Each structure stands twice: as structure tokens, then as C-alpha cells.
Amino acid sequence: RKCIGCKACEVACVMAHNDEQHVLTPQRFLPRITVMKHEQKRNAITCRHCENAPCARICPTGALQQDDGIVTMNAQICSGCQLCIMACPYGAISLESIGLPSATSETMAQKSMRSVAVRCDLCKDWMKREGKSVPACVEACPVHARSVVQIG
């Protein structure tokens, strides 16, 4: 099935990661999937969770880890160095300013803004919270062009 470029996957991704904030503003609309158009073809680009992922291999802080084929991100220890962005062969990692506890604070109430790498996490937390079996982008696609393939 072919992507029709409707961007429902982008909206679903943002909604799954929005922490109940209003997302339909340019400042908050930061999907972890991007619909690209080339000539008459459209395709949704996202992390491929590569085997032996170059982004995880190059991460100096260990913020990116590969566990059971899924590349996970620990924003708490990401330094924002952007090495993973340069290493990703799909251009599927971006930098986002987010509120995290500062190094000197002990509570989430004392947040400071800093930039961290952001990429597809296969909606792991959202799926658990909502009792879903597929990521938000897969569920939202009206033509069923998205799927999750289990390797191994």
C-alpha cells in the first residue's frame, strides 16, 4: 500500500508524545516521523531501528541503547552533541529543546530547557499507557501504508 501524503502519521506521532500539551502550534508540532514527497511519490521517513545502529554505537553518553532490536533514548543523559544525527543514515534524528530537571535541581518542578536528540521510539510509552499493540503512526494511517516488521 502506498502513502498518500496525508500526514496523519505525523499528527498521531505528535499527539502520542505531547504530554497533554496543545500540539497544533508550530512551536509544539515536532513529529518523530516526516512525510516526504518526491515527484509523485510520498513516503513517511522515521527511524529504522537498524541492526547494529550507528547512532547507538557513536553516542558518547550511552543515551542511545539498542535493546531487543529497538533503539531506545534516555533524554536524561543525552548531551545534545548531535553525533547521532550525523551518524543516522536515514536522517531520522532531530534536536529538540525540552524541559528536563537541571543538573543542580532535584525535582521535575525545577526544569531547565536544553537540547536533546529526539527520534522514533515506536511509541513504547504510549502503547503501554493506552493499551495499544502498534505505534500511533501505524494506527492512524488511513490507507494502512505503515506497519511494524518484527525481525528475528
Residue positions per predicted region:
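Non-ligating segments of multi-cofactor redox enzymes
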Residues: 1-152
